[in-house]
């Protein structure tokens, strides 16, 4: 099963990294190498601060662009990783080994499974399920 692991951010993670945070990032690099060696790692990236972001609000056919930063946001994503694991228990076991990139305050990680083709069986035809995806969607196994 594939999961996306969200590394939650905060107003602190939106700031320039401290020396302690940089040390924690080095520990995260070591952890990522462990994921690679175990065949679990698919992809990962850190995200720039919300000050460099945009949000698009959909209202019917209207689209409104809002510039960051998003100080009012209660939850921000600082980074993500995609893993291929046997089950949620394996994902939880890996998260238990993950370094805290914000060692001076509580951190939070959210694990969300991807939809697999079988999860969509009630919504698509058998022919659509049997048709392999091509391009980037095929590489990532996107349902």
Residue ranges and their predicted role:
Residues 1-143:
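Conserved, structured core segments of small domains
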